[in-house]
């Protein structure tokens, strides 16, 4: 995100994510954390990692539920970043449902970006497809990065989000070399917007594969991922790579046919 006036972090954790944004020169940083004890313990035991970011002059702490915070104020952000606990924890799915993403859109600037951690392990393939497709219902451009075994969803409705930027926010020119860190980040892209678009097509009726406050699909489905007998991480990676490769084949006119849900979903 080249525009770095203000950002919101939902979930403090160890505080490292908030520190990264602070160190990358966001002018203002808001943090919404449900538990004051989390912040106190993180600063006590991980202060050398988070740099006590919660105490910085340009950082405001809000001890409240992240979704309620967005609901009860009208600030708009350049970036909203979320790295919560696993979806299957009670209540966490409220920040992965369609209504939440609708709310997030109203709290982002027109060129704003949502960044959200998503687990790839202990996640049944169909549940992961639900999650990605739910986000895509509200955001035109969606990427999935997998770095260090962790998934990160990046979403925006701005055409400018498809441009490539350096970590310092400057645009990548044709003759500009990426740093080694930036190259590793680019190598971590597992699904591009074209791949996510193709995913929606394979679902036949994408509006059905959506988790909402009314059906609570992710709330009740994701806990079952802890009991599967197969390697969910490996199967999910393979499924998503297959989707992305098929999407690329269609773009270059070299596809033998669509991958339908029954062929991309593993045991669930």
Question: Over which residues does each language-model region extend?
Answer:
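The AdoMet/dcAdoMet-binding core of the Class I SAM-like
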Residues: 1-132, 136-138, 257, 265
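Soluble small-group transferase modules, centered on the S-adenosyl donor enzyme superfamily
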Residues: 1-8, 64-67, 72, 122, ...
């Amino acid at each position: 995100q080249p525009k770095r006036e203000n950002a919101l972090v939902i979930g403090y954790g160890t505080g490292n994510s908030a520190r990264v944004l602070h160190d990358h020169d966001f002018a203002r940083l808001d943090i919404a954390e449900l538990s004051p004890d989390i912040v106190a313990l993180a600063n006590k035991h991980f202060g050398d990692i988070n740099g006590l970011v919660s105490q910085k002059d340009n950082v405001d702490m809000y001890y409240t539920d992240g979704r309620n915070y967005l609901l009860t104020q009208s600030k708009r952000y350049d970036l909203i970043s979320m790295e919560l606990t696993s979806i299957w924890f009670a209540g966490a799915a409220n920040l992965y449902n369609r209504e939440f993403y609708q709310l997030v859109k109203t709290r982002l600037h027109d060129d704003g970006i949502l960044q959200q951690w998503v687990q790839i392990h202990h996640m049944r393939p169909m549940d992961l497809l639900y999650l990605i497709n739910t986000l895509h219902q509200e955001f035109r451009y969606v990427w999935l990065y997998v770095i260090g075994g962790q998934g990160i969803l990046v979403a925006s409705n701005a055409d400018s989000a498809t441009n490539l930027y350096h970590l310092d926010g400057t645009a990548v020119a044709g003759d500009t070399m990426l740093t080694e860190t930036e190259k590793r980040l680019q190598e971590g892209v597992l699904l591009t917007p074209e791949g996510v678009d193709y995913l929606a097509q394979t679902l036949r009726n994408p509006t059905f594969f959506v988790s909402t406050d009314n059906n609570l699909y992710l709330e009740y489905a994701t806990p079952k991922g802890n009991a599967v007998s197969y390697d969910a991480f490996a199967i999910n990676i393979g499924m998503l790579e297959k989707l992305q490769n098929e999407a690329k084949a269609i773009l270059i006119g070299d596809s033998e046919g669509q991958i339908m849900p029954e062929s991309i979903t593993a045991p669930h």
